[in-house]
Amino acid sequence: MEQAFIPSISVFQPHQIVCLEHEMSCLYAEVVQVATKRQICWVRPLLLSETLVAPSESDRPIVYDLRQGADLLWPVSLFRPALDTEVIPLLVQLETADREPESFQIARQQFNCFIQQVWQAYKSEFQAS
């Protein structure tokens, strides 16, 4: 699914959950601060949700825990407000998931891959105006 670029009518507020969509993945993050003059959003990633192309028996997305990872400073235009109804089930899935020792490393790799794909797809959004 391609991200729709809609000029930000309302500025995001601190602690608001936002979503950055790209293809079959969604990054959910908490807003820390917005630099309105530069249209940059400082966010703290919470989770990355990936929907499989082939439906599985559970139809639940794969969820990666990003709460121990790095923050991002990215263009506001890439984000949209996240709905409670979409975030809460993912957070529940995240909390009930088995904690394997290598899960943080896998989550970090998936996050890095996602960030690189988004950057490649929307390079023009990162150009200084």
Predicted regions and their residues:
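Short, structured beta-strand/loop micro-motifs enriched in basic residues and often containing a Trp
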Residues: 1-3
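Short beta-strand-centered aromatic/proline hotspots
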Residues: 26-36
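Intrinsically disordered, low-complexity, charged/polar segments
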Residues: 49-129
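Short, solvent-exposed secondary-structure boundary/capping segments
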Residues: 38-46
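Short coil-to-beta transition motif at edge beta-strands of beta-rich domains
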Residues: 5-22
